């Protein structure tokens, strides 16, 4: 039996037990969530080096970092270094979104190096291979696409991002919608180009039962990619985006009936006042499926600072119910992120996730903050740095100050509020 079947049969699997320990919840809570479809467990049994990660209602908000080969930039060694940096920074998952070069070799390295669940977007490789084989990606055959999907699942990929809900009807709506930025999804735009060139329905939608058969065979989670995500605030929650969400809701139901774990991807650029509505809409139309959001970016003008932009949107979206944040780096809209920007993007997304977990009342999040606050009150710098979301940077900043051995912070020095108040209240920690 696969994970959903086990959960529905009342059986608690080792993966459910592992997730329960990580999350500080009961195995029964995890089992019920998997059975209901409000929790997915990212793991492929063919990978021995991966720790299962739970995503969904009642669990910690998770973060994903994206890497991959793009054009002439970097190489496999560079992307592997980014994976290691993202893992060290605390990402919960890695997405290998390679679009060129030796995609097969890159994926093999990603699966070997990452101890975290790995996701891919098989369409990228299928399009690249079709371009080499037939001279153009628009000549890709259905069989080529499904072959790559199965190869990724068989290789051990833990979750597959697939544009199953981008239908020809939605493409026609988008054509007439008057969007400022008609299409910003890389995979979605290539798929739609194929559909229009061939005058064919999306094969991932037309042959969705075949998608389900592969996912069920390998017990792989499907992540419904969004071809119609808004690329600017003005396009948020327009007809094509909402119609695609309606279709995805129907496919969520079919996936669950087939015993396949599924989550939904969204949304891109969303103004603050629409964040809650966007999440509520997904939860309603997609039957409570876990929501995996890119950003969201709450302004269009933050070039060079989009990791901060995304952290704002991510925190509010996760507070509203989104459970999985796709990181955004400072290089977004400009170029390919370097290792430092990858690390910075993960930390920014983790801060957003943690802020939402606090707002949502998760005990583990609250205790983490309280522990650091106690250490701060006691001027216990070693403990503060260890508890910081980025201990390496916190420690470096502490060491860079001229009086690093002093008890108080550099801002207040001998007038440290913690030290003075503790002295008068008789709560000073004399061992500091």
Curated annotation (Swiss-Prot):
<dbReference type="InterPro" id="IPR038521">
    <property type="entry name" value="ThiC/Bza_core_dom"/>
</dbReference>
<feature type="binding site">
    <location>
        <position position="333"/>
    </location>
    <ligand>
        <name>Zn(2+)</name>
    </ligand>
</feature>
<feature type="binding site">
    <location>
        <position position="416"/>
    </location>
    <ligand>
        <name>[4Fe-4S] cluster</name>
    </ligand>
</feature>
<dbReference type="GO" id="GO:0009236">
    <property type="term" value="P:cobalamin biosynthetic process"/>
</dbReference>
<keyword id="KW-0479">Metal-binding</keyword>
<feature type="binding site">
    <location>
        <begin position="226"/>
        <end position="229"/>
    </location>
    <ligand>
        <name>substrate</name>
    </ligand>
</feature>
<feature type="binding site">
    <location>
        <position position="409"/>
    </location>
    <ligand>
        <name>[4Fe-4S] cluster</name>
    </ligand>
</feature>
<feature type="binding site">
    <location>
        <position position="124"/>
    </location>
    <ligand>
        <name>substrate</name>
    </ligand>
</feature>
<dbReference type="GO" id="GO:0051539">
    <property type="term" value="F:4 iron, 4 sulfur cluster binding"/>
</dbReference>
<dbReference type="GO" id="GO:0046872">
    <property type="term" value="F:metal ion binding"/>
</dbReference>
<keyword id="KW-0949">S-adenosyl-L-methionine</keyword>
<dbReference type="Pfam" id="PF01964">
    <property type="entry name" value="ThiC_Rad_SAM"/>
</dbReference>
<dbReference type="GO" id="GO:0016829">
    <property type="term" value="F:lyase activity"/>
</dbReference>
<feature type="binding site">
    <location>
        <position position="163"/>
    </location>
    <ligand>
        <name>substrate</name>
    </ligand>
</feature>
<keyword id="KW-0456">Lyase</keyword>
<comment type="similarity">
    <text>Belongs to the ThiC family. 5-hydroxybenzimidazole synthase subfamily.</text>
</comment>
<feature type="binding site">
    <location>
        <begin position="185"/>
        <end position="187"/>
    </location>
    <ligand>
        <name>substrate</name>
    </ligand>
</feature>
<feature type="binding site">
    <location>
        <position position="95"/>
    </location>
    <ligand>
        <name>substrate</name>
    </ligand>
</feature>
<feature type="binding site">
    <location>
        <position position="292"/>
    </location>
    <ligand>
        <name>substrate</name>
    </ligand>
</feature>
<dbReference type="GO" id="GO:0009228">
    <property type="term" value="P:thiamine biosynthetic process"/>
</dbReference>
<keyword id="KW-0169">Cobalamin biosynthesis</keyword>
<keyword id="KW-0411">Iron-sulfur</keyword>
<keyword id="KW-0862">Zinc</keyword>
<keyword id="KW-0408">Iron</keyword>
<dbReference type="InterPro" id="IPR002817">
    <property type="entry name" value="ThiC/BzaA/B"/>
</dbReference>
<protein>
    <recommendedName>
        <fullName>5-hydroxybenzimidazole synthase BzaA</fullName>
        <ecNumber>4.1.99.23</ecNumber>
    </recommendedName>
</protein>
<feature type="binding site">
    <location>
        <position position="269"/>
    </location>
    <ligand>
        <name>Zn(2+)</name>
    </ligand>
</feature>
<feature type="binding site">
    <location>
        <position position="412"/>
    </location>
    <ligand>
        <name>[4Fe-4S] cluster</name>
    </ligand>
</feature>
<dbReference type="GO" id="GO:0005829">
    <property type="term" value="C:cytosol"/>
</dbReference>
<comment type="function">
    <text>Together with BzaB, probably catalyzes the conversion of aminoimidazole ribotide (AIR) to 5-hydroxybenzimidazole (5-HBI) in a radical S-adenosyl-L-methionine (SAM)-dependent reaction. Is thus involved in the anaerobic biosynthesis of the benzimidazole lower axial ligand of the cobamide produced by M.thermoacetica. Requires BzaB for catalytic activity, as BzaA alone displays no activity.</text>
</comment>
<keyword id="KW-0004">4Fe-4S</keyword>
